[in-house]
Amino acid sequence: MTSENNKIYLYPLWLRIWHGVNALGIILLIITGIRLQYSDLRLLSMDFGTAVQMHNISGVVVTLNYFVFIIGNLVTPNKKYYRIKPKGLVKRVRKQANYYLSGLFKGEEAPFPISEKRKFNPLQKYAYIFVMYIFVPLAILTGIALLFPELIIEEVYAVSGVFLTALLHGSVGFLISVFLIIHLYVASIGKNPLDNFRSIVNGYHDVHPKEEDPKEKK
C-alpha cells in the first residue's frame, strides 16, 4: 500500500471489481427477492418467472464472487483489516457508538480515523465480519438448498424443512438489506458525502494527517 499527497491506496483493483459486482448482485437479489416474497406485487413490471430467473442468476454470480473475496483476503494484505482483537473490544465499540450517536452531530473528530493500518472503525469492522463471514454464507447455503430442495431435511419437529430453509434465507436477506442501507448512510459521513464513494472507484482515500492518532488501535 502506498501513500501520496494525503491519499492512501486502500482499495486495490481486485477489491474494487469485487465490490462493484457484489453491490450490483446484492441489489438485484433484494429487488427480485421482494418480488418473490410478495407475489402480487408488480415490481418494475417484472413477472414472477423473470424474477425467479434473475434471482437465481444473481445468486450464482454473488456466490462465485464471494470466493473472490475469501481468496483475496487469504492471499493479499487486505486480510489484516479483518483480524479480531478481543482486548479492549467493548471499549472501542462503545467509543465509536457514542460518536455516531452524539459526537458526530457535535462536530467532534472521528475517534478511529482511517489510516494505512486501519481501514474500518470498530463498529464497521465487526459488522463487516458478521455480514461477510456469517450472513452471506448463510444466504448462499440456504439459497443453494432452495435451488435443490431434495437436499433439505423433510421435516424438523413436524415443521417443513423447505419452509424453515426459506424462512432463514429470507431473514438473512432482510438483515443484509438493512446492513446495505446503513452501509450507504455511513459511507456518506465525512467532509464530503461523496468522498467514500470516489474512494471505491479510484482506490484512494483522502486522509487528513491531523486526524491520525497512531496510539489508537484497531
What do the PLM-derived regions correspond to, one by one?
Residues 1-218:
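Membrane-embedded alpha-helical bundles that constitute the cytochrome b-like, heme-associated redox core
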